[in-house]
Amino acid sequence: MLQQSPPSISPPALLTLAITLPVLVSRHTLPLATFYGEWTAAVLCVALITASLLQRRPASSSNPLPFLIVLIAASLLQALTGTTDLSGSRLATLAVLLLCGAMTGALRLYLTPPSDNQRTALLTGLAYGCLIAALLGALTQWFQLFRLEPDSFHLVSPYFYDTNRRLWGNLNQPNHQATVEGLALAATVWLASRGKLRFPMWLGAVILLESGIVLSGSRTGVIHVGIAAVYALIAAWLARNNGGCRSHPMTRPVGLVVAAALLVAVLLILQPAISAAGHAFDWNLFDTVAELQAADQTAARVSLWKHAWLMFKTHPWLGVGWGEFGWYQFEQLKQVGVTVEMSLHAHNAILDLLAKTGIIGAGGVAIALSVWLWRVVRERLIRGDGEERRQAVVVLTWLAMLCTHSMLEYPLHYLYFFLPFCFMLAWLEPARPSRFTVPGWLVRALGVVFVVVAGWVLVTMWQDYRRAEAREYADQAHFDKLPMPRFWFREYAEADRAQRTTLTPENAAALLPAHIAAVHLLPTPTMIARSAWLFALTGEPDKGREWLERLRYYYAGDEARQYAWVNRSCQNVAASARPQAFCDWIARKARKTRAVEDADSGDDNP
């Protein structure tokens, strides 16, 4: 008898899991709220790479996407030229870029020689993954609407705001949840056009998905509905010579035109219906329509973009580095002169790349993606047959949604969005004639090395995050007994330790570097005030005043509380060690803001 090979999960099935599970992870903790979801995405990506390499003996060369190589090269150049990286973000970014490079390379090998069946199976797996993730995510939003999280067996992330509620599912970010639901809307059209979703199931899915978009209060989600409707019209045009099937009306052009109209109509019906129900039952939902009509809806983004542009102008070639956006934003608060929310990203992918990687990084990415797009349009849309065009259009629709979101936020900084983004780029990449082959033994050897290294990284990341997390939530009595992270997230643990330490004139000089590093990690009002006091204690009162004065441009900078704390610190230190001129200035500032300070005056250590 013939021996059967051991059962294994196919790459399309693993792809569905890799899309679905990470965005459904409900656990969010400090110091990195998205760690568990992103770690899950990385684990499943490694599994997908391994499964892809095991499916066949690759016989041709395969390179990762050029834009990934550009970003890796820019990161290495930053390291070689001494660009600051006190936050430790460069190493983590390199690890992510290498993981995505391995995934795209494995996908290209898996699809060599080109196989229509394999390409279609992967696309179907991707569509099902988007749909399942979004449907379950929308259900979690309804759980949150009725405050049922305590009865969900920890499967639903808690929602903790009482007013202007924008329900976020398990992603803890409403715009991200809306993007997942937008991707799923396009997936429903694709699956229905293939006869895999009958009309009643399709309509039910659309109603649930668009209810999730309404509950998220996301303006980006409204745009996604429009993109999905346009895709349905394009799909109808592409299906004009397809004939379709009488038992599946959505495989025909008329059915897809109706789908486009229904996508818009359902949103127009659900928006006022849910709003009216919210007022009737005191759901306290966010008013998306009113926000869309507001004249200043982009003001916060424009302020961030001004900071990003100034970073690019002052660091044009290689940018400020991957983890230094917040630090440079803090440094230039007075120079820009507008009130702004402190952030680690520009909330615009183009400006973010310009600020962080300069002309070399952003320009290289622009060239690489422009060449990629031209090749895709030429080979997939112009020269491709009808089926190839239909498949390419849905993937381009998904990419359009991710890029639209990236113009207003930073979804591609999260693995559960960036990995699918890279996968779609690689899936669309036209096959090129190969000049040389890669021996099977070499591929297997590299695969083993990759699995070992990736396994070590994932295990140590898990261990170190758990250590950083335990320290974050520990009380002071047990804090010093807990181990520090060894390889990853040490900067977060150091910042937490610095913030917990009582400041005195005796330890000021020793603690100042750790506080500055913590501000590099994220400039919070608390660390800014503590650092300013340390500057004053170590003979740099002007620097301390400068740091505190920047709080006036810091959205929610909590000036009153920070001035009050520094003022109390001045009063509690011995006169011989007190920087008197600085303390006199602080006393005057504290008096001016005393009315605001009273609410928080009980806190002695911010």
Task: Say what each PLM segment does.
Residues 30-34, 87-89, 171-175, 217-224, ...:
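Membrane-interface catalytic loops of GT-C/OST-like multi-pass glycosylation enzymes that act
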Residues 141, 236-296, 304, 310-314, ...:
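A membrane-periplasm/extracellular boundary helix in multi-pass inner-membrane enzymes
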Residues 224-232, 375, 383-441:
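Transmembrane alpha-helices of multi-pass inner-membrane enzymes
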Residues 2, 12-24, 28, 40-52, ...:
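Alpha-helical transmembrane segments of multi-pass inner-membrane proteins
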Residues 28-31, 83-95, 161-177, 293-299, ...:
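Short aromatic-rich membrane-water interface segments that cap or initiate transmembrane helices
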Residues 173, 302-343, 350, 357-364:
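TM-adjacent membrane-interface loops and short helices in multi-pass inner/ER membrane proteins
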Residues 1-92, 98-104, 108-124, 191-200, ...:
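Transmembrane signal-anchor hairpin modules in multi-pass inner-membrane enzymes, especially those
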